[in-house]
C-alpha cells in the first residue's frame, strides 16, 4: 500500500494592528483597583470585602514572560470601566470576527504555499473557543475563500490545533482529501 506523502506547504498569521504593553495594561488595571477600593472602602474597612491589590509590569513579565500583546480592540481593554474587547454584534449572515481573522491568516498560508483556494478540498477550523456555534466557522471560511470539498470545526480544548493537523494528515493518508486547510483563529 502506497501512502501519499503529507507535507506542510504554507503558513499564515493574522496580527492585529494594535498592541498593549504591560505598562498600559497595568495602568488601566491599577486605575480599576483604585476605583474599586474607593467604592468599597466601608466594606473593606468592615472586613466584608477584600481590597484589591495593584499589579506591576514586572510581575506580569515574571509570571508569564509576556511584555506586550496584540489586540483587536485596544480601547475597550484600556478602559478601566470595561477592561475587555468591545465588538459589534454580527448576524449569522455576516462573517464572524474569528472567521475574518481566520480568512486573513488562510490567505497568507495559501499565498505562501502557492495554492489556490479552489484547490482545497477540506477545511478544518481547530479552536479551543468558538465565537458562536452556528454557522460553523470552517464553513464560513470555506465559503469566503471559495474552497471546495467539505469543512468542519473541531474543539479539543488546548490541543485543538494538534488534533487538526493529525486529522488533516489522516484524511490525506486515507485519500479522502488531497489538500487540507487547517485554521486556528485564536
Where are these regions (language model features)?
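Conserved "HGTGT" condensation-loop signature of ketosynthase/thiolase-family condensing enzymes
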Residues: 1-119, 145
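Short glycine-aspartate micro-motif
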Residues: 5, 122, 178-182
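Short beta-strand segments
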Residues: 9-12, 126, 155, 180-186
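Short linear motifs at secondary-structure transitions and domain/linker junctions
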Residues: 46-47, 98-101, 130, 156-158, ...
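Short glycine-rich phosphate-binding loop at a beta-alpha junction
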Residues: 118-126
Amino acid at each position: 500500500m502506497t501512502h501519499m506523502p503529507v507535507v506542510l506547504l504554507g503558513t499564515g498569521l493574522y496580527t492585529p494592528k494594535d498592541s498593549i504593553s504591560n505598562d498600559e495594561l497595568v495602568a488601566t488595571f491599577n486605575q480599576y483597583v483604585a476605583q474599586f477600593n474607593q467604592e468599597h472602602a466601608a466594606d473593606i474597612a468592615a472586613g466584608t470585602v477584600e481590597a484589591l491589590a495593584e499589579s506591576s509590569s514586572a510581575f506580569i513579565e515574571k509570571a508569564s514572560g509576556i511584555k506586550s500583546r496584540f489586540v483587536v480592540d485596544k480601547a475597550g481593554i484600556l478602559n478601566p470601566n470595561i477592561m475587555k474587547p468591545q465588538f459589534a454584534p454580527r448576524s449569522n449572515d455576516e462573517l464572524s470576527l474569528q472567521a475574518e481573522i481566520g480568512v486573513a491568516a488562510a490567505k497568507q498560508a495559501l499565498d505562501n504555499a502557492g495554492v489556490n483556494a479552489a484547490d482545497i478540498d477540506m477545511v478544518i477550523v481547530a479552536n479551543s473557543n468558538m465565537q458562536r456555534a452556528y454557522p460553523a466557522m470552517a464553513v464560513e471560511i470555506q465559503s469566503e475563500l471559495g474552497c471546495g470539498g467539505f469543512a468542519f470545526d473541531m474543539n479539543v480544548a488546548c490541543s485543538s490545533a494538534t488534533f487538526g493537523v493529525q486529522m488533516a494528515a489522516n484524511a490525506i493518508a486515507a485519500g479522502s482529501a488531497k489538500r487540507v486547510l487547517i485554521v486556528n483563529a485564536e
